[in-house]
From Swiss-Prot:
Residues with site note (Important for bifunctional activity): G116, F117
InterPro entries linked to this entry: dCTP_deaminase, dUTPase-like_sf, dUTPase_trimeric
Protein's organism: Kocuria rhizophila (strain ATCC 9341 / DSM 348 / NBRC 103217 / DC2201)
Oligomeric and partner information: Homotrimer.
Bilayer-spanning residue ranges: none
Entry protein name: dCTP deaminase, dUMP-forming
Reactions this protein catalyses: dCTP + 2 H2O = dUMP + NH4(+) + diphosphate
Chain positions recorded as dCTP binding sites: K101, S102, S103, L104, G105, R106, D119, T127, L128, E129, Q148, Y162, Q174
C-alpha cells in the first residue's frame, strides 16, 4: 500500500523512516522530494573495451565534485551517476521507490535507468542514474529537487532486511554515487 503524506510525516516524526537532513517542506501528497548532492561519477570510456557486469572494473568511473553554487552540466546522450543529498534509512516493513520529477522529465532528464526500488532495511544515499535525453545540455544544481521517494507498507516485516547479509548488502551505507558492484553477486544461468 502506498503511504500518504499524513503517514509519511508520522513515520518521519517517529524516526521509523529517516531522511537526513529532513525538511518537512519536501513532503508531497504521497511522496517526499529528494535533492541532488554535489558528487557525480563519470564514465571513463577509454579505460575498457566494453563493460562486463561479471568483472570488477575499478577504473570504469571517476568521482567528480562540484562546488555548492556551481552546476554540473549533463550533455545530450550523456549518462552519469549522481546521489541524493538525503541519507535514507528504512525499517524492515517499509520499501521505497525513487521516481523522477515530472518538471525535469519534461526537460529530458531521467533520474534512474532501472534501479528505482529501495529495499526495506536499506540505509544510505540513493545513487541516481542520470541521463539527458534532450538535445541541449541540462544544468544540474546541487541542492535542487531531482526526484521523489514513494513509500510502501509491506504486508509484514521482511524476514531478512537489506543489510542483514542474507540477500546481499553491497550498497548498504553508501555515501555519494556508488559504482556498480554487480561482480560481487553475478549470476548467469546456462541456457541450452
Amino acid at each position: 500500500m502506498l503511504i500518504s503524506d499524513r503517514d509519511i510525516r508520522r513515520h518521519l516524526d517517529s524516526g521509523r523512516v529517516r531522511l537526513e537532513p529532513s525538511d518537512p517542506a519536501m513532503v508531497q501528497p504521497a511522496s517526499v522530494d529528494v535533492r541532488l548532492d554535489r558528487w557525480f561519477r563519470l564514465f571513463d570510456n577509454h579505460k575498457y573495451a566494453h563493460i562486463d557486469p561479471e568483472q570488477e572494473q575499478p577504473e570504469l568511473t571517476r568521482l567528480v565534485e562540484v562546488a555548492p553554487d556551481e552546476p554540473f552540466v549533463l550533455h545530450p546522450g550523456e549518462f552519469v551517476l549522481g546521489a541524493t543529498y538525503e541519507k535514507v534509512t528504512l525499517p524492515d516493513d517499509i520499501a521505497a521507490r525513487l521516481e523522477g520529477k515530472s518538471s525535469l522529465g519534461r526537460l529530458g532528464l531521467l533520474t534512474h535507468s532501472t534501479a528505482g526500488f529501495i529495499d526495506p532495511g536499506f540505509s544510505g544515499h540513493v545513487t541516481l542514474e542520470l541521463s539527458n535525453m534532450a538535445t541541449l545540455p541540462i544544468k544540474l544544481w546541487p541542492g535542487s529537487k531531482v526526484g521523489q521517494l514513494c513509500f510502501f507498507q509491506l504486508s509484514s516485516p521482511t524476514e531478512h532486511p537489506y543489510g542483514s547479509g542474507a540477500y546481499g548488502n553491497r550498497y548498504q551505507g553508501q555515501r555519494g554515487p556508488t559504482a556498480s558492484r554487480s561482480h560481487l553477486n553475478f549470476h548467469r544461468t546456462v541456457i541450452e
